[in-house]
Amino acid sequence: AYKNRVLDSVYIGGGTPTTLEPAQLDRLLAALRANFDFGTVQEFTVEAGRADSITKEKLDVLKKHGVGRISINPQTMNGETLKLIGRQATPEQVREAFAMARAVGGFHINMDIILGLPNEGEADVTHTIEEIAAMKPDSLTVHSLAIKRASQLSKWIEENGMETLKNTDRTMEIAAQGAEKLGMHPYYLYRQKNMSGNFENVGYATEGKEGLYNILIMEEKQTIVACGAGSITKMVYPDGRIERCEDVKDVALYIEKIDEMIARKRGFLKYGE
């Protein structure tokens, strides 16, 4: 329904697209370019996410297809915490993946961290910020911990208690000061469900490196066409009214009902024209 429509931004993420093999990534990105006009695209982002999923071959594929922004998300640069929350990548792998992306070149690199992780206090956050400052990303997203019910972290908290979560005004301040030292300014913030404490997620960026998609999705002033299990297509009408069309979250069920999902979304998009 939206083939050859004008696009402002393309964002592939929400999970970790770089878990795909290089050939699969190549096929996905080639299909996008074959079916949509990229002539007006101002921003093309792929979440590289976990450092252990990043290889030079995958980065070369992203660059070949014109991806200009990637996100490498350590969450913390403390190895023990990474093990505790079920992250396979080590701090060293994060540094290696970042250096590899810089060597390939052509990418704006964002990094995500999470404040309020179990047993992490001010010293741990300071260490993470210092490690990130040494790498010099173009932007930084500071998340306050949101606890997902089915996660390894959720089970750990059930056993050890919420008092292990130590996000405070001071840890938020440490992150903000670190971003400022990198020449970044805050440009968007949002809250989400199940967050620990009365905090928010804040995006920081150096001048001119702000994420267009992040701004558009927060302001809810532009239609977003989403594809994939758990994705939500959002239609913004001229009168400001917003309607949503959700795909089922379960991957197996999504595959089983793919024809139904496509037909439903086609009808939704056609109705919104």
Tell where the protein language model's regions lie, with residue ranges.
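Short, glycine-/Ser/Thr-/acidic-enriched flexible segments
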Residues: 17, 194, 230-233
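Conserved non-cysteine loop/helix-boundary elements of the Radical SAM core domain that shape
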Residues: 1-175
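A short acidic (Asp/Glu
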Residues: 121-122, 199, 237
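Alpha-helical structural motif
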Residues: 28, 171, 192, 247-254
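A C-terminal junction/extension of Radical SAM enzymes
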Residues: 150-227
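Radical SAM enzyme core and accessory elements
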Residues: 203-273
